[in-house]
Amino acid sequence: MKAKELHDLSTEELQKKLIDFKDELFRLRFQLATQQLENPMRIRDVRKNIARTQTVLRQRELEAQKA
């Protein structure tokens, strides 16, 4: 998911996405441990999506403090 797409979402939607990404990362790590993971690059992608989502949430938090 691109950062621009994340900026278009509401704060509640972002928080839900963050939970979904973390859940997916948990499942991917479990698959990796049991050697059932077909695409290990997906772990990296999900981690980056988590970081992007947290960044957008933090930016909104800082904007709210300024206002």
From Swiss-Prot:
Keywords assigned by UniProt, alphabetized: Ribonucleoprotein, Ribosomal protein
Entries under Pfam families matching the protein: Ribosomal_L29 (PF00831)
GO BP annotations, alphabetical order: translation
GO cellular component: cytosolic large ribosomal subunit
GO molecular-function terms, A-Z: structural constituent of ribosome
Tagged with keyword Chloroplast: no
Ribonucleoprotein among keywords: yes
Family: Belongs to the universal ribosomal protein uL29 family.
HAMAP family: Ribosomal_uL29
UniProt name for this protein: Large ribosomal subunit protein uL29
Originating gene: rpmC
